[in-house]
């Protein structure tokens, strides 16, 4: 029986899940917005929120814990130097999940996960698609 077992398996082994969540967290910290399936977005949210809380703590031990989780010192530096000060006055709730329809092909529910007060200059996947499509429309109309 599966009583009180938290988290989704997502049809992956434990090591695959751990690597996938680390990669998704790195992408989310880099772009501040990613498009993924809804179950993956719901699973990655507590992981990244915990990392932002580590960044707010700011000590050497917290930095080493974040590096152990992310495996990318550059993204940990952005987490501690850019994102943590931005959310210094906010107690949790750093991420937003918005439903984004269904994927063509397998009809999987998609979602956009992004930081709440994100920097719009750090273009995420949705912004990149939007700007490319508007540029293509301008070229086609002229």
From Swiss-Prot:
Assigned keywords, A-Z: Ribonucleoprotein, Ribosomal protein
Domain of life: Bacteria
Signal peptide: none
Gene3D superfamilies per UniProt: Ribosomal protein L17
SUPFAM superfamilies linked to this entry: Prokaryotic ribosomal protein L17
UniProt keyword Transport present: no
Listed GO MF terms: structural constituent of ribosome
GO CC annotation: cytosolic large ribosomal subunit
InterPro entries linked to this entry: Ribosomal_bL17, Ribosomal_bL17_CS, Ribosomal_bL17_sf
Keyword Ribosomal protein: yes
One of the GO biological process terms: translation
PANTHER family, A to Z: LARGE RIBOSOMAL SUBUNIT PROTEIN BL17M, RIBOSOMAL PROTEIN L17
Subunit field text: Part of the 50S ribosomal subunit. Contacts protein L32.
Family: Belongs to the bacterial ribosomal protein bL17 family.
Protein name per its UniProtKB record: Large ribosomal subunit protein bL17
Biological source species: Bartonella henselae (strain ATCC 49882 / DSM 28221 / CCUG 30454 / Houston 1) (Rochalimaea henselae)
């Amino acid at each position: 029986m599966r009583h009180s077992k938290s988290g989704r398996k997502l049809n992956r082994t434990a090591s695959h899940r751990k690597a996938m969540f680390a990669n998704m967290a790195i992408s989310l910290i880099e772009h501040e917005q990613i498009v993924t399936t809804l179950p993956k977005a719901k699973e990655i949210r507590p992981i990244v929120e915990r990392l932002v809380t580590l960044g707010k703590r700011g000590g050497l031990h917290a930095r080493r814990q974040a590096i152990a989780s992310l495996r990318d010192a550059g993204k940990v530096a952005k987490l501690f130097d850019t994102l943590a000060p931005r959310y210094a006055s906010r107690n949790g709730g750093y991420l937003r999940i918005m439903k984004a329809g269904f994927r063509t092909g397998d009809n999987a529910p998609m979602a956009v996960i992004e930081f709440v007060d994100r920097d719009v200059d750090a273009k995420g996947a949705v912004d990149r698609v939007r700007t490319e499509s508007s540029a293509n429309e301008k070229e086609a109309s002229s």
